[in-house]
Amino acid sequence: MRKANKFSTEKRLGYKKRENFMGFDVGTHRIGYGVIYWNKSGPKILKAGMIVKDKKFSFLKDFKKIEKLIKNVKPKLVVLEKIYFSRNVTNALSVAEVQGLIKYACEKSKVKFLEVHPKSLKLKISGDGNADKNDIKNSVNYLLKINKKFKTDDIYDALALALYGSMFI
């Protein structure tokens, strides 16, 4: 694994006026989310966790959970991973539907969103466009100085997406 990129706090103006950046990692059964902000010492975690999707496929319940989270956090930008191709079309469609809910919640809350290609995310966060899940986890731990372990990779991926988004504002 290559050494993770060290963000320059001098280049980041986000710590002068606190801005939150949010990432969503959408899966077929759960949604990982991560929210970061910057201060003088670098990026910090504000909130991270999981939304378990409704088993009865109630889009309204899922939407309300997502909308409430976005309204509470008030992010400057929400970042999603772009769906580029999937061998399992059913899973890809399920993920796309939830991403649509997230985009709608962003539009409704007047929050900008960005979709990023997985290779671009991996390159920016770990320095390697072909990084695996473990490399991303290690890079996120390093960049955010995380002391605890999260239960799933979805949370690490969501935090990586939030970090990615914070570099573009």
Show which residues each predicted segment covers.
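Phosphate- and other anionic-substrate recognition elements at nucleic-acid/protein interfaces
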Residues: 1-169
